[in-house]
Amino acid sequence: MFSNIIEIIILSIVQGISEFLPISSSAHLNIVEIIFEFNSNSLMIDVSLHLGSLLAIVFYFRRELLDLRNNQKLLSLLIIGSIPIVIAGYVISSTGLVNLLENNLKIIAWTTLIFGIILYLADKSKFDKKISSNLNFKTILYIGLFQILALIPGVSRAGITITAARLFRFNRFDSSKISFLLAIPAIAGASVLQLKNAIGQSFELNYLVLISITLSFLFSYFTVKFFLDYINKFSLNVFVIYRIIISIILFIIIYN
């Protein structure tokens, strides 16, 4: 029991911190599970980890989400931008392709490195477009298509959507805001698919589910708050450097 609680605490903290930073939550969860040899295969725990993050981002942007009732254009843009990841996620989940990508340290190492470099290149330019006057259907669709790459562990959903938004000349804060708003349907869709697969599982671990939702919520919420404050003042270089360090460590583990 105690080991299960420790495992859930670690996974919840990792999920909460890494979900909304451009460092890939799926990669970090895979790495932690492999290194610490966690053996929990409960899909309900996976659902609860994502549910905590989903509740956090919804709570943080609650005013913006309520304002969507009076901003039909932004609502339509978010729907358009979410269609690609919803379709791709369903296809990959239903065909079993997701199993080929999970727990593959080589894939994680290479994607962490490559997409970290791409993030650096996209963030170098001093663009200053704002969502309010420059986000259109074509742009959000392209960003949504980029988001499909996040299905590969190590790419990072936040990282690739921020990268795409920066490539379309949005400033760092608005690029991050686009990323976080697109995260809501993406995480919700992933949770629905996981919940569908979890139907029929035993619910003996309800207390672990409660712990994982609570911790994931708290760490996700404060990570979003920290990141948006940080991105107003600094570049994304620290996350690029972090990704490079992680990829080097993974390459050492793999090839030694």
Swiss-Prot record:
Keywords: Antibiotic resistance, Cell inner membrane, Cell membrane, Cell shape, Cell wall biogenesis/degradation, Hydrolase, Membrane, Peptidoglycan synthesis, Transmembrane, Transmembrane helix. The chain crosses the membrane at residues 5-25, 41-61, 74-94, 100-120, 135-155, 180-200, 208-228, 234-254. Its EC number is 3.6.1.27. One of its GO terms (cellular component) is plasma membrane. GO terms for biological process: cell wall organization; peptidoglycan biosynthetic process; regulation of cell shape; response to antibiotic. It is a multi-pass membrane protein. It is found in: Cell inner membrane. Coiled coil: none annotated. The keyword Transmembrane helix applies. Its main location: membrane. It comes from the Bacteria. The keyword Transmembrane helix applies. It catalyses: di-trans,octa-cis-undecaprenyl diphosphate + H2O = di-trans,octa-cis-undecaprenyl phosphate + phosphate + H(+). Bacitracin is thought to be involved in the inhibition of peptidoglycan synthesis by sequestering undecaprenyl diphosphate, thereby reducing the pool of lipid carrier available. Belongs to the UppP family. Catalyzes the dephosphorylation of undecaprenyl diphosphate (UPP). Confers resistance to bacitracin. This is Undecaprenyl-diphosphatase. It comes from Pelagibacter ubique (strain HTCC1062). The lineage of its organism: Bacteria, Pseudomonadati, Pseudomonadota, Alphaproteobacteria, Candidatus Pelagibacterales.
